[in-house]
Amino acid sequence: MSTASLRKRTGSLTILGASALTSLLLAMPAFAGEVYLDGLATAQTHQKFIVTYKDGSTALASPSALTTSLRTAARAVPAKAGKALGLNSVRRLALGPELVRADRALDRAEAETLMRQLAADPNVQSVEVDQILHATLTPNDTRLSEQWAFGTTNAGLNIRPAWDKATGSGTVVAVIDTGITSHADLNANILAGYDFISDATTARDGNGRDSNAADEGDWYAANECGAGIPAASSSWHGTHVAGTVAAVTNNTTGVAGTAYGAKVVPVRVLGKCGGSLSDIADAIVWASGGTVSGIPANANPAEVINMSLGGGGSCSTTMQNAINGAVSRGTTVVVAAGNDASNVSGSLPANCANVIAVAATTSAGAKASYSNFGTGIDVSAPGSSILSTLNSGTTTPGSASYASYNGTSMASPHVAGVVALVQSVAPTALTPAAVETLLKNTARALPGACSGGCGAGIVNADAAVTAAINGGSGGGGGGGNTLTNGTPVTGLGAATGAELNYTITVPAGSGTLTVTTSGGSGDADLYVRAGSAPTDSAYTCRPYRSGNAETCTITAPSGTYYVRLKAYSTFSGVTLRASY
């Protein structure tokens, strides 16, 4: 083995000269208390803080000294609407720290300013957020154990920790499909929809378009839908897809839904022998809050549209215009890649622009044999042996049931559900483009084989939700995403050779910039550079260690720094933090 092929095994790299060390020591007061900023990432605003004063400090013995300490710190936060911030003691905790409360909610920047000012008091030992903790959720649905996509293997969605942070509450997912049947494990999450099938024969309800999105059944006899096409029973496809998105969860019954706090608007476009492009285009417009002549407005415009449907050919002008309109109204459009085991470039509407095209994976984390593939795939998701809500009828609706289906039709609603989770916790609604970037940047590499192209990887629900809560896009993104001082970006991952890029601007007088990576699996290499993006050969700091525990420390760092994580080997679950 040549020396060039050996990886360096070094400690963290510190860019520090002797004179710089002297000035650093002078700039960092020995009495400064510890500031725990991790809690800032748990919510968008904060109002209560825990301040630990040193033994023997006057603030512990004198209420007036405590009041003075709090008022001094509060003055560091700019006034709002002409009113200075108030900060008062609530009570002393059993272990001695003081619980204090601001008289208004503080955003993260304000909270950090306050915490640092509190810690500057020589009497203070530490400051932390009085953050809100939650019970961890394992739903009690009786068939959850059969839903491998919601399990704990690295082939699944990594959704259980995401459910502790988000349920999709307040979001709407439009399922453009065969309509829906009544199901006790689904009904509570269904809003009023619409039947857009204009042909009475296809619709089977005898009256064309109407406000009843019920699935009448899509069965057909041999040769009825074309010469040589065998007979088929009703699929209840829309009911299955809707259950994957938002089945009622934690109800001691049946299955769980990806975004079980979300609501579903069923939009019927597929009936006997399929559905027309013209009907589907109108349905996209309506579902996203657009106007369709002669049709009442949608009272619940969707943040997300799921289309588990498709056909051959290039993306038509009609379909593309409908999708573009939906995206312009802020609706993310998620589409099944198709089940032809061929390049997605030949599958409409997955080959349209402005959609998230989803390939299907197996429980082993490999591309499903039937799934379409190619450079047009954006992400992958579980699609094989997916258990969801169904109906027992072979033609017309019978009783509610459950069944497992295979297909990219099953993968797509998993992604639509994750989008609902993301939008439900984002500080402000993300644009469809930002949603796509976030999903790609937080995706996990397939643990199994994929030939032909499976996009950025398997959607990682927890990483996506965490990135949304933190107001970021999870990494990557060409020009880089902005890091917040002291706030970790978690759940990062990339395939071998890929990279994630960030920036952070450090104000003058900050003393030291420390950038760290930690946790997870695989091997991510950290690069930091002042003023421009680092490369393999140009950087200010590159620890170049095996694994993910790397640190760059830079003194007198005012200015913009570019941070790069490059996958020496596929990594996932990595945390990145920059602080000054």
Curated annotation (Swiss-Prot):
Compartments, as annotated in UniProt: Secreted
Active site residues of this protein: 177, 237, 409
GO CC terms: extracellular region
Gene3D superfamilies reported for this sequence: 2.60.120.380, Peptidase S8/S53 domain
Cysteine pairs bridged by disulfides in the record: 225-273, 315-352, 450-454
EC id: 3.4.21.-
Keyword Transcription regulation: no
One Gene Ontology term of the molecular function aspect: serine-type endopeptidase activity
PROSITE patterns, alphabetized: SUBTILASE, SUBTILASE_ASP, SUBTILASE_HIS, SUBTILASE_SER
InterPro entries registered for this protein in UniProt: Peptidase_C_arc/bac, Peptidase_S8/S53_dom, Peptidase_S8/S53_dom_sf, Peptidase_S8_Asp-AS, Peptidase_S8_His-AS, Peptidase_S8_Ser-AS, Peptidase_S8_subtilisin-like, Peptidase_S8_subtilisin-rel
Boundaries of every Peptidase S8 domain copy: 147-465
CDD domains reported in the protein's UniProt record: Peptidases_S8_13 (cd07496)
Main location: secreted
GO biological process: proteolysis
Leader peptide range in chain numbering: 1-32
Propeptide residue range(s): 33-136
Keyword line: Disulfide bond, Hydrolase, Protease, Secreted, Serine protease, Signal, Zymogen
Enzyme class: hydrolase
Family statement drawn from the similarity comment of this UniProt entry: Belongs to the peptidase S8 family.
Protein known as: Extracellular protease
Natural source organism: Xanthomonas campestris pv. campestris (strain ATCC 33913 / DSM 3586 / NCPPB 528 / LMG 568 / P 25)
Native organism taxonomy: Bacteria, Pseudomonadati, Pseudomonadota, Gammaproteobacteria, Lysobacterales
